[in-house]
Amino acid sequence: MAKKSMIAKQKRTQKYKVREYTRCERCGRPHSVMRKFKLCRICFRELAYKGQIPGVKKASW
């Protein structure tokens, strides 16, 4: 889990647009966040396996 202080810091409007970054909506993780779903890879995988993300299914080839 991300620190509450870091999540609060990120939510504030930044002075420069470049300083803004994405965070996972579910756990607050700052790395490997998918913009389309606003989830990190770990949360995305958990929810996809449970079938809670519409239109996402496990690939097999």
UniProtKB/Swiss-Prot annotation:
<keyword id="KW-0689">Ribosomal protein</keyword>
<comment type="function">
    <text>Binds 16S rRNA, required for the assembly of 30S particles and may also be responsible for determining the conformation of the 16S rRNA at the A site.</text>
</comment>
<feature type="binding site">
    <location>
        <position position="24"/>
    </location>
    <ligand>
        <name>Zn(2+)</name>
    </ligand>
</feature>
<protein>
    <recommendedName>
        <fullName>Small ribosomal subunit protein uS14</fullName>
    </recommendedName>
</protein>
<dbReference type="InterPro" id="IPR001209">
    <property type="entry name" value="Ribosomal_uS14"/>
</dbReference>
<comment type="subunit">
    <text>Part of the 30S ribosomal subunit. Contacts proteins S3 and S10.</text>
</comment>
<dbReference type="GO" id="GO:0019843">
    <property type="term" value="F:rRNA binding"/>
</dbReference>
<dbReference type="GO" id="GO:0015935">
    <property type="term" value="C:small ribosomal subunit"/>
</dbReference>
<dbReference type="GO" id="GO:0008270">
    <property type="term" value="F:zinc ion binding"/>
</dbReference>
<dbReference type="GO" id="GO:0006412">
    <property type="term" value="P:translation"/>
</dbReference>
<keyword id="KW-0479">Metal-binding</keyword>
<feature type="binding site">
    <location>
        <position position="27"/>
    </location>
    <ligand>
        <name>Zn(2+)</name>
    </ligand>
</feature>
<keyword id="KW-0694">RNA-binding</keyword>
<dbReference type="InterPro" id="IPR023053">
    <property type="entry name" value="Ribosomal_uS14_bact"/>
</dbReference>
<dbReference type="InterPro" id="IPR043140">
    <property type="entry name" value="Ribosomal_uS14_sf"/>
</dbReference>
<feature type="binding site">
    <location>
        <position position="40"/>
    </location>
    <ligand>
        <name>Zn(2+)</name>
    </ligand>
</feature>
<keyword id="KW-0862">Zinc</keyword>
<keyword id="KW-0699">rRNA-binding</keyword>
<dbReference type="Pfam" id="PF00253">
    <property type="entry name" value="Ribosomal_S14"/>
</dbReference>
<comment type="similarity">
    <text>Belongs to the universal ribosomal protein uS14 family. Zinc-binding uS14 subfamily.</text>
</comment>
<feature type="binding site">
    <location>
        <position position="43"/>
    </location>
    <ligand>
        <name>Zn(2+)</name>
    </ligand>
</feature>
<dbReference type="GO" id="GO:0003735">
    <property type="term" value="F:structural constituent of ribosome"/>
</dbReference>
<keyword id="KW-0687">Ribonucleoprotein</keyword>
<dbReference type="InterPro" id="IPR018271">
    <property type="entry name" value="Ribosomal_uS14_CS"/>
</dbReference>
